[in-house]
Regions:
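Short, positively charged low-complexity motifs
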Residues: 8-9, 21
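Short beta-strand-to-coil "C-cap" segments at the C-terminal boundary of structured domains/repeats
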Residues: 192-197
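Short amphipathic alpha-helix that is part of the acyltransferase structural core
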Residues: 14-58
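Short hydrophobic/aromatic beta-strand or adjacent loop that forms the aromatic wall/cage
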Residues: 58, 186-191
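Acyl-donor binding region in acyl/amide transferases
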Residues: 31-35, 76-183
Length: 197
């Protein structure tokens, strides 16, 4: 498969056959490029099961076919308490997390794993990536795309609870004065992928 990089635009173009039609029929037809926070958030809000639940990201990429975006991926620094059992506090340089990954339902088979691979190649041009962390919600997924992308399965995370008030998660602050309840959160499948410098 031909890969060509255009370092001036930060794009990594995937081979696109002639007369490919107006919709992608192969994951190889996408062009992956950096996108703005706004573009990523709008796409993720529409296509990710969590919607726009707050998350912090530093690097974001989109999968395009022509002018249409079919996927968005966001990378950011992992929450230090979430990965504290994996590394010492002084050993977290070069560690990022896939904060969100979303693709349209009309994206061709294997699009997610290919999109991850190309996005990581672009990311490594901007950031000295040593380790990539990602999670799959055990109530919805088993992490097939991460396994297909070469991630190592570590296991399930510890059970956590969220405080719910009026049908919504109370994200921050004191809860003792609120009329709500603690609800167990589904565990997450934890995956890691390491990279040599």
């Amino acid at each position: 498969m031909n890969l060509c990089a255009d370092s001036s635009t930060g794009e990594l173009a995937l081979f696109q056959g002639q007369d490919g039609g107006s919709i992608p029929t192969s994951a190889h037809q996408f062009i992956v490029r950096p996108i703005s926070k706004l573009t990523a958030n709008r796409f993720i809000e529409r296509h990710h099961y969590l919607g726009i639940t707050p998350f912090l990201s530093t690097y974001r990429y989109g999968a395009y076919f022509g002018d249409l975006i079919y996927g968005a991926i966001a990378f950011g620094t992992p929450n230090a308490t979430d990965i504290s059992g994996l590394f010492s506090k002084n050993n977290q340089d070069g560690v990022l997390e896939i904060k969100r990954l979303a693709m349209t339902d009309s994206a061709p088979k294997n699009s997610e794993s290919r999109f991850i691979a190309i996005s990581v190649r672009l990311l490594r041009r901007e950031y000295p990536l040593r380790l990539l962390v990602t999670y799959a919600d055990s109530s919805l997924h088993v992490g097939t795309i991460y396994k297909a992308s070469g991630f190592e399965y570590v296991g399930l995370t510890a059970t956590k609870c969220d405080f719910w008030v009026n049908g919504k998660i109370n994200q921050r602050g004191k809860v003792s004065h609120l009329d709500g309840k603690w609800v167990p959160r589904s565990q997450k499948h934890l995956f890691l992928k390491s990279f040599s410098p």
